[in-house]
């Protein structure tokens, strides 16, 4: 056989062998590389939400006072948050007030008590800024409070209820612990439906004063 043909055959055989070796090497590297996650982890919501999620949904949430009369269904997961600090203290105070008032509290009563702590709607506060905006917009938007008109009230009055996120992240037991700390009583001694005298402003003020100084869940 001519020398040129033999040389070409050797080159072709060598090239084929190199191709086989390259394919084997690529297959080996692919098997050793971890598979990328098909779904990226969800990022926390913009408002202090943590990584732990609950499958509950926000069912009746109004984002601003102007939308309170037309409550819309919002289908999104309720995420447990790491809501801390002075705003948490203010929130827990309002939740406690709502609970002891029979699961709802009129806005006038809330501001009557907050006013004794130096918080007036529309007036800047050194810690909270505009407290009305924090309570009626931020807490409502985040799902901690429901803020809506009192039925058949004239002139129109508003009242607060626990929001869906408050039910997820807190409980009436935690609120009773909070109130019991003010009263120096064990929460197990409290009946589930505490008969609260709405005229007892001193007790209400004591609860919110305690909350304003700081609260940590038991």
UniProtKB/Swiss-Prot annotation:
Pfam families: MAGE. The keyword Phosphoprotein applies. Residues 1-13 have a biased composition (Basic residues). Residues 61-72 have a biased composition (Low complexity). Residues 1-197 form the MAGE domain. The modification Phosphotyrosine is found at residue 194. Keywords: Phosphoprotein, Tumor antigen. This is Melanoma-associated antigen H1. It comes from Mus musculus (Mouse). The lineage of its organism: Eukaryota, Metazoa, Chordata, Craniata, Vertebrata.
């Amino acid at each position: 056989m001519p020398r040129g043909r033999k040389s070409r055959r050797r080159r072709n055989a060598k090239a084929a062998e190199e191709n086989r070796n390259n394919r084997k090497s690529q297959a080996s590297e692919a098997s050793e590389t971890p598979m990328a996650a098909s779904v990226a982890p969800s990022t926390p919501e913009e408002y202090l939400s943590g990584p732990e999620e609950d499958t509950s949904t926000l069912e009746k949430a109004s984002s601003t006072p102007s939308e309170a009369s037309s409550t819309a269904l919002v289908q999104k997961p309720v995420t447990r948050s790491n809501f801390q600090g002075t705003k948490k203290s203010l929130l827990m105070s309002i939740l406690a007030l709502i609970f002891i008032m029979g699961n709802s509290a009129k806005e006038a009563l809330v501001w009557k008590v907050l006013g004794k702590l130096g918080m007036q709607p529309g007036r800047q506060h050194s810690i909270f800024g505009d407290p009305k905006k924090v309570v009626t917009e931020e807490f409502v938007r985040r799902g901690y409070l429901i803020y809506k008109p009192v039925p058949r009230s004239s002139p129109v009055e508003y009242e607060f209820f626990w929001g869906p996120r408050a039910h997820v992240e807190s409980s009436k037991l935690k609120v009773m612990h909070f109130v019991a700390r003010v009263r120096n009583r064990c929460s197990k001694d409290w009946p589930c439906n505490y008969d609260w005298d709405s005229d007892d402003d001193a007790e209400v003020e004591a609860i919110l004063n305690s909350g304003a100084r700081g609260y940590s869940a038991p």
